[in-house]
Amino acid sequence: MPGTKVLFLRALAASSAAFFLASATAATPEEPMLLVAKRSFEDPVYGSTIVLARPVQGGGHVGFIVNKPTKLNLAELFPEHEPSKKVADPLFLGGTVDMNLVFALVETHGSRKDGAIPIAPDLFLAYETKAVDRIIESESDHARFFLGMVVWRPGQLDDELDRGLWFVDEPEAKLVLRRKTDGLWEELVRRLEARANTI
């Protein structure tokens, strides 16, 4: 397990994430979605991104960029945590909010009892320290780990959609957790552009 100081810092950081994510377990009139940035969306962070997004109570949304691997891995982040050394995949940049916190997306068929919350079909999100550690230790082959998340204030994502910045698609666990993300954005953009042209 990570050292006591690391656990304390991660637990402290999780408090702000919990503020946004705890309400995601409540029923909302919207479904999770996969956002694919359009070619015209020129932004240094969100241009050419794919974002798994979910509504939360109050009209806001939270999400995770799924195609921005970093050069950092779990072993570098937690050098004293032996299970982290076995995870070869890089950490991904989930977004610019709470970048000091590690989140885990894990594919699960059925329900979970470890505090992870459903975020999309067959996908659960863990942000509490113990739940993330458990996934690192025993489910890393079916998970992806992120630094940070995306947060939209109430109405903010609706405005971005009205401005035509995003394509919207249904999230699929296999696509969201695809190991090789090079070319994934271009693949989805081409598919969604073709779909839009047939409507």
What function would you assign to each model-found segment?
Residues 25-199:
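A short aromatic-anchored loop/beta-hairpin motif
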Residues 1-13:
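Bacterial N-terminal signal peptides that target proteins for export
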Residues 10-22:
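Bacterial N-terminal signal peptides
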